Swiss-Prot record:
The gene is kdpC. It comes from Salmonella typhimurium (strain LT2 / SGSC1412 / ATCC 700720). One of its GO terms (cellular component) is plasma membrane. The chain crosses the membrane at residues 12-34. InterPro entries: KdpC. This is Potassium-transporting ATPase KdpC subunit.
Amino acid sequence: MIGLRPAFSTMLFLLLLTGGVYPLLTTALGQWWFPWQANGSLIHKDNVIRGSALIGQSFTAAGYFHGRPSATADTPYNPLASGGSNLAASNPELDAQIQARVAALRAANPQASSAVPVELATASASGLDNNLTPGAAAWQIPRVAAARQLPVEQVAQLVAEYTHRPLARFLGQPVVNIVELNLALDALQGHRAK
């Protein structure tokens, strides 16, 4: 019985430390130092949560920039079902999906003369990606400008304005957050696109 007391005391101490003190401390520090990130990087417009800067949304109207395809089953951009399609590059089903996406993108973007950007035809590993390269966003500018009856230059300027560059140039590539960009388009015109 004497040998159990130190083991039980150690277990109780570690349980309180790792199950109570550590989670409370990390939560408090996160809320103190990084409150926006710790609360999900939520985007607020007119005191309403419009989305998260970390999770993509399904934009299908011609007046919006479209993000990467979602690989989440049943409901696009479902954060509870995050994950890729798990189809191998050699799988004919993946090839058929990509070909169908390319055909749909070409039909929706008849003004685009260059090749369809890869990230518009392929889903990300999480299936929830909210960022595109500036090139993939630029590829969609003619469609969005025509649908919103805006000058192409004005939409291109908005894409440039919402292009986020990495802190150090060698640590990544510039990206455009599609959720933020589409909300900025709505704010520019004062309404939602049809």
